Amino acid sequence: NGAQFAFIKLLASKYQNLCVVGDDDQSIYKFRGADISNILQFEKNFNNARVVKLEQNYRSTKTILDAANEVIHNNKGRKDKTLWSDNEQGEKIDLYQAEDAYAEADMVASTIKENVDFGRADYSDYAILYRTNAQSRALEEKLLLRNIPYKIIGGQNFYQRKEIKDVLAYLRIICNATDDIAVERIINVPKRGIGATTVTKAKDFARAYGFNLYESLLEVENIPGLERAATKVRKFTDLIENFKDQQQSMSLKELVNEVLNETGYVAELAAENTDEANGRIENIDELITKVTEYEENTDNPSLAEFLEEVALVSEIDNLDEDSSYVVLMTVHSAKGLEFPNVFLCGMEDGLFPGYMSIMSDDPEELEEERRLCYVAITRAMKHLTISYAK
């Protein structure tokens, strides 16, 4: 940023003994203060600077480099250079148009699955890149459907997100009230005035009488020291008992919606009205979609079986570091990395490039998006697929 460059100029002012390595075409951190003019104006600040262009690329095929060059040459604010390679010409870049984000994600997942099943690639050969973290939801769903192991770099896998774990904890208690971990997780979520002291006393009572935690809560009136908390605890257990009764006459989707409505979980998030809270609501909507799809695709759907399936796919989050898996990440997170096969998803106006960049009066905003696209394209070594939804 400007302050850092001013500091460097002061440090180097006497002896001019300074070496700088950078690529203006990969300057993608304007949003956190990086200033591309530090590179573009470098020779003006250091008159005797010797410039060495490193234009040979050892990573990508000629086809991929040609595409990257075609994109970045549209930028005016850059040092003139053209990447070249002694690598093979390589495969053509695939361009895929989908009806919507889910069809796009389905194409990505099915392509990966087919290539791995036929021995043409390993899961670790693939990276899925996107502009914003929110785009990972549809991709995760389709990868999970095909049992494709994956990791999100710089983000959380779907079933590790707080709101998803909270809702699933309610469902686990309804299915099996002996699940002490689930009970402890949501006894005060959303906040209902049941504190850690109350939980500790209930656990002590449970140990003393051979109960599980939920059974102990049902006996709250008999637990010494919990007289004041008894009403709040009783409201919680009444809520759970009501859900257990309704489970018999409701579909799973109806049950989930009942839990969300009666607990006020979504209402509390909606009241926050922040981007983070709205993102959590969208994740919960995604969970409801998964529940609906499970019911539609299962002959005799049950809460217990659904939770078993969730437990199985959640194991993907605990992958061994040496195992083979697909990586998902934003383009910003991918800078400096390389992968044999790259899917660049969501390449439609308003998403990538972003709406604000398109509408901005500052041409530098769109040039930043173009640099980001250049970074994305040049992550691919062998094959690149660019996709977008109508």
Please name every model-derived segment.
Residues G22-D25, R32-I36, Q56-Y58, A68-N69, ...:
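A short beta-strand-to-loop transition that corresponds to the Sensor-1 phosphate-sensing loop
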Residues N1-Q41, Q56-S60, V259:
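Conserved helicase NTPase motor core
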Residues K14-N17, D23-D25, F46-V51, E88-I93, ...:
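Short glycine-/polar-rich loops that comprise or flank the Walker A/P-loop
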